[in-house]
A protein has these predicted regions:
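Catalytic cores of alpha/beta
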Residues: 188-192
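N-terminal capping/lid subdomain adjacent to the active-site entrance of alpha/beta enzymes
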Residues: 1-180, 185-187
Length: 192
């Protein structure tokens, strides 16, 4: 039989992070703990990360739903992906907690070179919204770290400044050297 509980934490950002909908200085997150009564010394842990104002599961009853899931973990264990479609962060937290438990609760639910510190996932270097100068510094740091693709969060600066930043990057780095991606995060209306 499984037992589950959760804890809420408020995480303070080291540096304010700009989004198209404002500046984040902190965020709330929840850690789910899942224990199998047959092995009570093993605790699977998963994180349910909520970005208020940005995520699909930013709803008023979020914590109430999480408490219900933890209280009734046996009812959810085999069908949580179907029952919790409106709560993707809870799905992620449960999936990670169950995988961690299956992996003897070593806090590496999906062992790999990445989780062992021997490699990294080379998808793209994420560039947070900031002043043009700070974004250029972030991009240079990502390129120095070996990234050939950067994804820029845009929408916090005025449109012309962001276009100018992209143009200046393209002048400095060819498309063969650097792939540019943008993430507007709802910065523009449908009409724009």
């Amino acid at each position: 039989m499984l037992h589950s509980s959760y804890s809420k934490y408020i995480l303070d950002f080291n540096k304010p992070s700009w989004t198209s909908r404002g500046v984040l200085i902190q965020k709330e997150t929840y850690f789910i703990r899942v224990v199998d009564a047959a092995k009570p010394f093993l605790v699977g842990i998963g994180e349910c990360s909520v970005f208020r104002g940005l995520g699909a599961d930013d709803v008023p009853d979020y914590e109430k739903k999480l408490a219900e899931v933890c209280w009734n973990i046996e009812e959810y264990k085999d069908c949580y992906k179907e029952k919790l479609k409106e709560y993707p962060s809870i799905i992620f937290g449960l999936e990670t907690a169950f995988a961690d438990l299956e992996n003897e609760a070593k806090m590496t639910p999906f062992p790999s070179d990445f989780t062992e510190g021997k490699g990294f996932i080379k998808i793209n270097g994420l560039i947070w919204m900031d002043s043009q100068e700070e974004m250029k510094k972030q991009i240079d740091a990502k390129i120095d770290a070996g990234f050939s693709c950067v994804k820029m969060k845009i929408g916090a600066l005025d449109f012309d400044s962001e276009v100018e930043l992209l143009r200046s990057l393209r002048k400095r780095y060819s498309k063969e050297k650097l792939q540019l991606r943008v993430d507007a995060n709802g910065a523009f209306s449908v009409d724009e």
